[in-house]
Amino acid sequence: MEIVSGASGWIEVICGGMYSGKSEELIRRVRRAQIAKQKVQVFKHSLDIRYDKDYVASHTGLKIEAIPVSSSADIERLVKDDTQVVAIEEGQFFDMGLVKVCQRLADRGKRVIVAGLDQDFRGEPFGPMPYLMAVAEYVDKLHAICMKCGNVASRTQRIIDGKPAYYDDPIILVGAFETYEARCRHCHVVLRREEDEK
């Protein structure tokens, strides 16, 4: 990623499945900005309470302080005029207004970094993330390792009571290792109730 100093704002998206390193990459970019003495604000969706409600935390234990919010409007309202970098964790949990909020912040000259799942457990586009990917200047899609076969994993497998989840299960279910596995396209399974009834 080649960034021109003094340029207007822009949007960066860090996406991929669970365990692909999205939070670690967001934390890395935030820390680099802080080392450069840039004013940074970090936000995360209030639904994400897996590790700590007031921190963005990676599965590996890295963490950085964040402001928990429940809507994209909260982010726009709380961003200070002198903030140079706005980082947003768990972008997929936000309402569709996040796309416009990020665009307005970038138009105001801010560097906006959004990390989140690009696909839900079904393997379908998740919330505002695909729209953010379309309007972002920079998109990095990270991959994990399939927990079944060891191939490159781009999907998130939801596991309920040791079995793959059903297609019509609720889209949002906050969890970590006990609920989700990284999977490749071949090993990713989504059950359909009509198949079980045959």
Swiss-Prot record:
NCBIfam families: PRK04296.1-1. It comes from the Bacteria. PROSITE patterns: TK_CELLULAR_TYPE (PS00603). Gene3D superfamilies: 3.30.60.20, P-loop containing nucleotide triphosphate hydrolases. GO terms for cellular component: cytosol. The gene is tdk. It comes from Dictyoglomus turgidum (strain DSM 6724 / Z-1310). SUPFAM superfamilies: Glucocorticoid receptor-like (DNA-binding domain), P-loop containing nucleoside triphosphate hydrolases. GO terms for biological process: DNA biosynthetic process; thymidine metabolic process. This is Thymidine kinase. Zn(2+) binds at C146, C149, C184, C187. It holds the Pfam family TK. One of its GO terms (molecular function) is zinc ion binding. The keyword Protease does not apply. It is found in: Cytoplasm. ATP binds at G16, G17, M18, Y19, S20, G21, K22, S23, E89, E90, G91, Q92. It catalyses: thymidine + ATP = dTMP + ADP + H(+). Its EC number is 2.7.1.21.
